Amino acid sequence: MEQVITKKKVLIVDDEPNVRRLSRTILSKNFDVVEAEDGKQAIEIANTQQPDVILMDMMMPKMDGLTACHAIKKDPATKSIPVIMVTAIGFELNIKLGQQMGATGYVTKPFTPNDLLDKIEQVLATP
């Protein structure tokens, strides 16, 4: 009897196609990856596909990452999904804003593959 191993699902949210492509390349070996290009799409996908973790860019058109994170964390159907803010803005104030909106972690661009994988594994290992 074959054992089926189910990969955890990661939602990558970034308005830059190159960042999504790089993140997908880094993550696709260990995770199922879905993508969104703005906060509104992220909320829809979080509700319909229930990812195990969300990597959310902070600054995007249509709806920024902080607003989307807050909406995801307010919704009973998605509030337990960890959100990791991934952004070029590493100021302490922005980190605190992300935490206030419900973000679980933070990764600053540019990041190494190990930075991203380590943060996801850390967040997924936290009960």
Each model region followed by its residue ranges:
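Active-site beta3 strand of CheY-like receiver
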Residues: 49-55
